[in-house]
Amino acid sequence: MKPPNPTNPNDQNVELNRTSLYWGLLLIFVLAVPFSNYFFN
C-alpha cells in the first residue's frame, strides 16, 4: 500500500473509503454470525 500523496487529496479519500468499507464488511460479518445461529437453530 503506497503512502498517500499530499499533492493529490483524492488518494486520501480513496484510502478512507477503502478503510470504511472494510470496517463495514467486518461489522456486517460480526452481526451476521449470531443472526445465522438464531435462524438455523
From Swiss-Prot:
It holds the Pfam family PsbL. The keyword Ribosomal protein does not apply. InterPro entries: PSII_PsbL, PSII_PsbL_sf. The keyword Transferase does not apply. Keywords: Chloroplast, Membrane, Photosynthesis, Photosystem II, Plastid, Reaction center, Thylakoid, Transmembrane, Transmembrane helix. SUPFAM superfamilies: Photosystem II reaction center protein L, PsbL (SSF161017). The chain crosses the membrane at residues 20-40. One of its GO terms (biological process) is photosynthesis. One of its GO terms (cellular component) is chloroplast thylakoid membrane. It is a single-pass membrane protein. One of the components of the core complex of photosystem II (PSII). PSII is a light-driven water:plastoquinone oxidoreductase that uses light energy to abstract electrons from H(2)O, generating O(2) and a proton gradient subsequently used for ATP formation. It consists of a core antenna complex that captures photons, and an electron transfer chain that converts photonic excitation into a charge separation. This subunit is found at the monomer-monomer interface and is required for correct PSII assembly and/or dimerization. HAMAP family: PSII_PsbL. PSII is composed of 1 copy each of membrane proteins PsbA, PsbB, PsbC, PsbD, PsbE, PsbF, PsbH, PsbI, PsbJ, PsbK, PsbL, PsbM, PsbT, PsbX, PsbY, PsbZ, Psb30/Ycf12, at least 3 peripheral proteins of the oxygen-evolving complex and a large number of cofactors. It forms dimeric complexes. Belongs to the PsbL family. This is Photosystem II reaction center protein L. The gene is psbL.
